[in-house]
Amino acid sequence: MSFAALEKTIDAAWEARDGINLQTKGEVRDAVEAALDALDSGSLRVAAKGDDGKWVVNQWLKKAVLLSFRLSDNKVMGDGPGTTWFDKVPTKFEGWDDSRFRAAGFRAVPGAVVRRSAYIAPGVVLMPSFVNLGAHVGSGTMVDTWATVGSCAQIGKNVHISGGAGIGGVLEPLQAGPVIIEDNCFIGARAEVAEGVIVETGAVLSMGVYIGASTKIVDRETGEIFMGRVPAYSVVVSGTMPGKPFPDGTPGPGLYCAVIVKRVDERTRSKVGINELLRD
């Protein structure tokens, strides 16, 4: 079945989703399985950059991921000693052997969990972390310890997602577009990016920065305010904006914001650059 035919079948199934269940067979089940396989292999992705440089979201692939929950039952699963789960989504590595891992070309250390339909490119290093279904992780990226990559999130090439950082998903609460981290970005420890925010090429988020769709991102030099995207090559830290005064005129509470303190320079890049030795 061509990708165009898959899209047509899944869009139609989505409109009739109340009638889809564990007993559903035939074209709908085959289309959903084919879509998940294409996401898993990287031949399709939930969002991709168009020729104009703008990101285009393939909503039908999100629908395929969601429909898979109606088509699948919970079952006992486990990939290693002492690991047993009960879920509808198998792990990506279920049944893999040495040759399969070598062909895939990435490293997954003990404790790394990746669900089926997430794509992991060659050269990626997965520390004990979690990558949810439908996500796409580009080559040379490091997902550090206890970091999470949410459902359908798009992570570019040579990105570093530091320990405990969180990249939000799209499935619950349902979001129109996935979080996108473009190439060569650095996401600091315990930082969070959610609600479809786009972090553009080469940006650096400091430790503990939280950015959602409504977070104000203030350029300290110009006063310009961005929302929903972090401009390319920005260095971003946590900050506050003055709040409205109380009725009696006393200062009100300040509100959280993110602050662009500068643009990435060689000094910054030397601190956040990837270590090629870890990717051999």
UniProtKB/Swiss-Prot annotation:
One example of a Gene Ontology biological process annotation: lysine biosynthetic process via diaminopimelate
SUPFAM superfamilies in the cross-refs: Trimeric LpxA-like enzymes
Pathway note: Amino-acid biosynthesis; L-lysine biosynthesis via DAP pathway; LL-2,6-diaminopimelate from (S)-tetrahydrodipicolinate (succinylase route): step 1/3
Enzyme Commission code(s) on record: 2.3.1.117
Domain of life of the native organism: Bacteria
Pfam families: Hexapep_2, THDPS_N_2
Reaction catalysis annotation: (S)-2,3,4,5-tetrahydrodipicolinate + succinyl-CoA + H2O = (S)-2-succinylamino-6-oxoheptanedioate + CoA
Gene Ontology CC terms: cytoplasm
GO MF term (any one): 2,3,4,5-tetrahydropyridine-2,6-dicarboxylate N-succinyltransferase activity
Family: Belongs to the transferase hexapeptide repeat family.
Name this polypeptide is given: 2,3,4,5-tetrahydropyridine-2,6-dicarboxylate N-succinyltransferase
Source organism (scientific name): Paramagnetospirillum magneticum (strain ATCC 700264 / AMB-1) (Magnetospirillum magneticum)
